[in-house]
Amino acid sequence: MEYRIERDTMGEVRVPADKYWGAQTQRSLENFRIGTDRFRMPLEIIRAYGMLKKAAARANLELGELPEEIAKAIIQAAEEVVQGKWDDHFPLVVFQTGSGTQTNMNVNEVIANRASEILGKPLGSKYVHPNDHVNRGQSSNDTFPTAMYVAVALALHQRLYPAVEGLIRTFTAKAQAFDQIVKVGRTHLMDAVPITLGQEIGSWAAQLKTTLAAVKEMEKGLYNLAIGGTAVGTGLNAHPRFGELVAKYLAEETGLPFRVAENRFAALAAHDELVNVMGAIRTLAGALMKIGNDVRWLASGPYAGIGEITIPANEPGSSIMPGKVNPTQVEALTMVVVRVYGNDHTVAFAGSQGNFQLNVYKPVMAYSTLESINLLADAVASFDAHLAQGIEPNLERIEEHLQKNPMLATALNKAIGYDKAAEIVKKALKEKKTLKQAALELGYLTEEEFDRIVVPMRLAKPHEGA
């Protein structure tokens, strides 16, 4: 491998000749060999940083803080970072300084060297300087949280929201299709009064809508950016209008209403907005756990379980039991949920660890949140495509359970009273008879009266037509 010499304030460093990074990135590579292959800084952060550095160069150009030639080269190089052209030039891990300084400098060095190259200058020449030009008016302390918020907001819009909204559409369609299928309701894991299969699946769609709306509400906090606060929130070394312009340009590029945080001291010292978003994502994940559990119970069997719905058989379920079909998509989804719960704890605890003017757990907060978004998006899309869209009713089993359901007697309360209805249920269960047989033998109702009162669909939709 060929090397070139890069320099920083600590001296000379050998850097691979074909890489755009510089001395500080190389030092970080050598000093933080922690999870190198498994915990790389997410590319979402790198791309967001590219947007930020482009916006910063535009702002500095407008404010007369950078020469036009330098600014335009930075803008071009930063756009190449956004497009993913230099992804393999960002090798650093999450576990570095808690302010994300090494990643900020990795981005600064790559853009500076690429911009210098665009202007016909050799790598390492610092014709475009990583600190004086690319990082002008900035600190790692305000740029990393800015890139973090931009990255998470974009990941929500590009990954999580479409996946969950797709599953909501699937459940809504299934709810409409199965609206006339009456089945046993269940509370406390015990038989209860009837509902329709459509009502049951419709409740899943409603729960997802509610929890997704909460994520979207919490996302609004991410629009408040730390940029312009520089090292401690005072804005030292930044033009007074710099942060405002950067936020404006980021809003233009992303289509999201980014703005400068009202209090940039708080924006550096705490990241409660991200903690709130992650908490809402965890709540959404909890809804998916509930739905997944419902699905696997309803599909359990085929003979010794509930078996009221069927799900697609995507692959053999067992290496020893021939013909077995397992709810594998549910199991994958719920394992992701467990991971998200762990990540939420990481983000919540990390968010509590700000000291004075800076929280120094930013990279792990960013990584954990982005991992949760990406895992959930993938798992929900997989669950939707390979399971939810293939849910079908097992009409024979549904009817069998419905006819045996003693809770149909609830419909008799108004006609004969709670006590007599309970007596009918006890007799039916003890003597293994239908409710109708028990009611007739006790003489509390005629056959005509029973048939008129105990209508399962009317129990499931008592107010329809009212």
Swiss-Prot record:
Top-rank taxon, per record: Bacteria
Cited CDD domains: Fumarase_classII
Catalytic EC class: lyase
Site (Important for catalytic activity): 331
Classification via PROSITE patterns: FUMARATE_LYASES
Keyword Iron-sulfur found: no
InterPro entries, sorted: Fum_hydII, Fumarase/histidase_N, Fumarase_C_C, Fumarate_lyase_CS, Fumarate_lyase_fam, Fumarate_lyase_N, L-Aspartase-like
Protein's organism: Thermus thermophilus (strain ATCC BAA-163 / DSM 7039 / HB27)
Gene it is expressed from: fumC
GO molecular-function terms, A-Z: fumarate hydratase activity
Name of the protein this chain belongs to: Fumarate hydratase class II
Cysteines paired by S-S bonds: none
Pathway it works in: Carbohydrate metabolism; tricarboxylic acid cycle; (S)-malate from fumarate: step 1/1
GO cellular component entries: cytoplasm
Further remark: There are 2 substrate-binding sites: the catalytic A site, and the non-catalytic B site that may play a role in the transfer of substrate or product between the active site and the solvent. Alternatively, the B site may bind allosteric effectors.
GO biological process terms held by the UniProt record: fumarate metabolic process; malate metabolic process; tricarboxylic acid cycle
